[in-house]
């Protein structure tokens, strides 16, 4: 019988004042992997992936601003730059350097933007399910659905 590993639920306050929630699957000292969910996701969206990776990596699954147990954005700032600053602040707060960044959908866009501005922080980048550009009609549809 296999024992299911449970992550530690933690929060970190960034210099910007926003509190971000994340799941830490342990294994300190192993290479760090930071997982970013999609628009309608949250840190637990990565539970199955995290369980598979946590034997060999320190897996951190972040609730991005406005999602899961993280704070809503101050003044409603959900810009790409704000997400990039959150990733930078989070990685600095946890002393992550040379980490692997994995992003799905919106998290993939944020990961790609982060890599473009802070590639020196990354060892690897994995992008899952993003398109080449943002179509305004898609943004309008998502806004209506939310």
Task: Give residue spans per PLM region.
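Active-site loop/oxyanion-hole signature of alpha/beta-hydrolase fold enzymes
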Residues: 15-16, 23, 51-54, 61-102, ...
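Glycine-rich His-Gly loop
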Residues: 35-38, 105
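Conserved catalytic-core motifs of eukaryotic protein kinase domains, centered on the activation segment
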Residues: 45-47, 70-76, 136-139
């Amino acid at each position: 019988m296999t024992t299911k590993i449970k992550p530690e639920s933690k929060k970190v306050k960034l210099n910007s004042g926003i509190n971000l929630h994340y799941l830490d699957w342990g294994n300190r000292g192993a290479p760090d992997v930071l997982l970013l969910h999609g628009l309608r996701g949250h840190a637990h969206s990565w539970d199955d992936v995290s369980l598979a990776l946590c034997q060999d990596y320190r897996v951190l699954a972040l609730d991005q601003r406005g999602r899961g147990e993280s704070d809503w954005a101050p003044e409603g700032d959900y810009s790409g730059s704000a997400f990039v600053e959150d990733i930078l602040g989070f990685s600095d707060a946890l002393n992550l350097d040379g980490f692997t960044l994995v992003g799905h959908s919106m998290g993939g866009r944020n990961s790609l933007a982060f890599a473009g501005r802070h590639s020196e922080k990354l060892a690897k980048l994995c992008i899952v399910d993003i398109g080449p550009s943002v179509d305004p009609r898609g943004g309008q549809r998502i806004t209506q659905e939310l």
